[in-house]
Amino acid sequence: MDANTKTILFFVVFFIDLFSPNILFVYAREIGNKPLFTYKQKTEKGPAEWGKLDPQWKVCSTGKIQSPIDLTDERVSLIHDQALSKHYKPASAVIQSRGHDVMVSWKGDGGKITIHQTDYKLVQCHWHSPSEHTINGTSYDLELHMVHTSASGKTTVVGVLYKLGEPDEFLTKILNGIKGVGKKEIDLGIVDPRDIRFETNNFYRYIGSLTIPPCTEGVIWTVQKRVLYFFCFCYRLIIFVTPYINIFWIFVFVFWCMLM
């Protein structure tokens, strides 16, 4: 099959993906075969019901500053904060599936960010697809969260949004780990968080919450304004290693590999 035909097929598949959000059904935090909560809207364990599923999750329904949100100029601050600085460095890391996402955890010292003279140590990063935050109503294909904690137990999360395009350096380097990921940790060796390319020159800042139960509030969110790109192969792999009931995309992926 020639290159033009492959290109046409890719864009047909892409636009089906873009306009078919109901194809994907996400289940998370399983005990045995029973999920504790899901991401599927309008179900008994979907986001609107999280606060009723466990007394410790009550704030998911009653909270006043819940995340994610639509990032608009009227709602949040778009700033260049001189009081924010990043000090990341390469360190040993592992990758695993948590059921609701794929997570890279730094076992060594991956560095920190400093916000208003408070240090927050980098703990882990994970992905959500499609993006949880939107910018002026626009959703993106992928969202990376870099989770940090302070010595006093406070949490700050850096969010980076992605859309399909050129290969992403960070995802490309951990691709083999993503391919084999499961509930058990896989050693990635040394992983450099600087490859994520989080920029501090323009970002959205607001106080919100964790985006999964128990939806704890008081989280400092920093979401980069610039949207990055990533290659579709990494995108599909991340989707496949999370528990999506997605027979359609399994078929598409196998078919596409046969054409390569």
From Swiss-Prot:
Q: Where is the signal peptide?
A: 1-28
What is the annotated localization of this protein?
Answer: Plastid, Chloroplast stroma
Catalysed reactions listed for this entry: hydrogencarbonate + H(+) = CO2 + H2O
| Protein name (record) | Alpha carbonic anhydrase 6
Glycosylated residues are N136
**InterPro entries xrefs:** Alpha_CA_prokaryot-like, CA_dom, CA_dom_sf, Carbonic_anhydrase_a-class, Carbonic_anhydrase_a-class_CS
Q: Name the job this protein performs.
A: Reversible hydration of carbon dioxide.
The protein's UniProt keywords, in alphabetical order, are: Chloroplast, Disulfide bond, Glycoprotein, Lyase, Metal-binding, Plastid, Signal, Zinc
Q: In what way is this protein post-translationally modified?
A: N-glycosylated.
The UniProt similarity line reads:
Belongs to the alpha-class carbonic anhydrase family.
**Segments crossing the lipid bilayer:** none
The first-level EC class reads lyase
Any idea where the Alpha-carbonic anhydrase domain is?
A: 35-260
Name the SMART domains for this protein. Carb_anhydrase
Q: Does the keyword Zinc apply?
A: yes
Q: Which CDD domains does the annotation name?
A: alpha_CA_prokaryotic_like (cd03124)
EC number(s) recorded for this UniProt protein: 4.2.1.1
